[in-house]
Each structure stands twice: as C-alpha cells, then as structure tokens.
Amino acid sequence: MALVKVKPTSAGRRAVVKVVNKDLHKGAPYAPLLEKQIQNAGRNNNGHITTRHKGGGHKHHYRVVDFRRNKDGIVAKVERIEYDPNRTAHIALLCYADGERRYIIAPRGLKAGAEVVNGAEAPIKAGNCLPIRNIPVGTTIHCIEMQPGKGAQLARSAGASVMLLAREGSYAQLRLRSGEIRKVHIDCRATVGEVGNEEHSLRKLGKAGATRWRGIRPTVRGVAMNPVDHPHGGGEGRTGEGRVPVSPWGTPAKGYRTRNNKRTDNMIVRRRHSK
C-alpha cells in the first residue's frame, strides 16, 4: 500500500491523500455473499432521528463476513482481497477445500494464494483462527470473541490489534490499543496477526462532498444554535459555551464516564484512562 497525493486541479482535489493498494480485486464482489442493506438515515420506525448526522451516501450491499470462523480443520485458500464499503478494513475471500466460500477480515500481510485454517490445531500464522487457550502469550491478535461462539467483536477495524498478556485459570488478559486491559474466556476464538489497511487513518478526503458520499451529514456547533436548540446556544455575537461543555441533552461532553454495565465491570482489569 502507498499514500498518493492527487494533482491539485481544483480546491477539492488539492488536499486529497489516497491509500492505493494494487493488490485489491478490481471486479465485482462475490454475489452469493451479498445482502441488501436498507438505509434508514438515522431514523427509527417512527421516522424520528435517533442518530444525528446520518443520511444520503452511496448505495451499497452488505458483505456477509464470517466472524465465527467455525469451519475447523479444512484448509482455505485466499482467492482475493477486496474493498468493503461497510468497514475500514479490507476483506479476504476464502475458498475452502470443500468448495465453500466465505469472507473474513483481511489481516496485515495476507495476499491472494495464501492458505489459512481454523481450529485448535491451527499453526500460529497470520490469518489462522484458534481458541485463545492455544495461542502463546505475547502474540498479537485481532477479531476476538467476547463470549465463546458469539463471533468476533473486538479489534475489527483497520490497523487494530490486541496483545495477549497472560492466562490465569479460565480467563486471559488482553491489552487493547486504548490501553484498557480486560479479561476474556480462554475458549473464545481470535485470529493471529493485526488487521490490514493500517494506513487508513492517514488518508484525507479533501472535500465535504467526499464525506457526504459516505452517508455523513454536517455537524452544527452548539454555540451556533439558539438557546431552545442547545445548552450552548444564544448570546449576542460570538460567545463561548459559558459553562461545562455538554451534549444537546445536558450530558457532560468531556471526560464524563457514561459506562453503565455493572454486570461486566469485573471483566475490566484496567480502564483505558486510568493512570
């Protein structure tokens, strides 16, 4: 992969920085693994906005990605690496020895023609998926289950990875990129390596329209609103918040803890912001 600056033929092109990957498949995706994706523009079944700043954007299909990796003991060959508009990471199309095809999150360094395998006996190689109990301490992993058999939930975005720190009894300790250390059952599965497309965070879209293509609408500052619309609103001329920064509903916006799940608090060994 390489970062490419675009020739500044216009103001909208001047700031563009693209991530170019010549190994990406240039054709259509694998049709049997596509599903229709309905765009709701952040509205619920009543038509009310439940998530702001969503709407528009280019139409696309959902790619069904295999997050469970439960097809054990059968070698799969990587047919190609594809772009996925639904996530920051790229996806790899696997063809198993019995002819079945599945998409997985493409790890860093995985290329077409490589072989991967799932199961407890799988070797420690990038792209292989196996239970955490069989992975050596100190290994970098991604696509980690939080409950056995539920499917990967942790470290799925571009460039993400988790360090396996230790195993104590039935649980393993993982250090996330945020600095959080949490426990996960050793029967949960994880994939060896880190997620590919790690240069995704270095790209620059260059213009507002490119953000709109992705279904993201503009964000209006609270201080630019009227008092009826936001706690920061109102005032004569340009003014600041005049108070602790809050959301439109009055929740403190900076540093306020909003986690409220006591049932799983004991799984977090060290919070991400603790010193």
From Swiss-Prot:
This is Large ribosomal subunit protein uL2. Residues 229-241 have a biased composition (Basic and acidic residues). GO terms for cellular component: large ribosomal subunit. One of its GO terms (molecular function) is transferase activity. Residues 223-275 are annotated as: Disordered. Part of the 50S ribosomal subunit. Forms a bridge to the 30S subunit in the 70S ribosome. PANTHER family: LARGE RIBOSOMAL SUBUNIT PROTEIN UL2M, RIBOSOMAL PROTEIN L2. It comes from Laribacter hongkongensis (strain HLHK9). GO terms for biological process: cytoplasmic translation. Belongs to the universal ribosomal protein uL2 family. The keyword Ribosomal protein applies. It comes from the Bacteria. InterPro entries: NA-bd_OB-fold, Rib_uL2_dom2, Ribosomal_uL2, Ribosomal_uL2_bac/org-type, Ribosomal_uL2_C, Ribosomal_uL2_CS, Ribosomal_uL2_dom3, Ribosomal_uL2_RNA-bd_dom. The keyword Ribonucleoprotein applies. Keywords: Ribonucleoprotein, Ribosomal protein, RNA-binding, rRNA-binding. It holds the Pfam family Ribosomal_L2. One of the primary rRNA binding proteins. Required for association of the 30S and 50S subunits to form the 70S ribosome, for tRNA binding and peptide bond formation. It has been suggested to have peptidyltransferase activity; this is somewhat controversial. Makes several contacts with the 16S rRNA in the 70S ribosome. Gene3D superfamilies: 2.30.30.30, Nucleic acid-binding proteins, Ribosomal protein L2, domain 3.
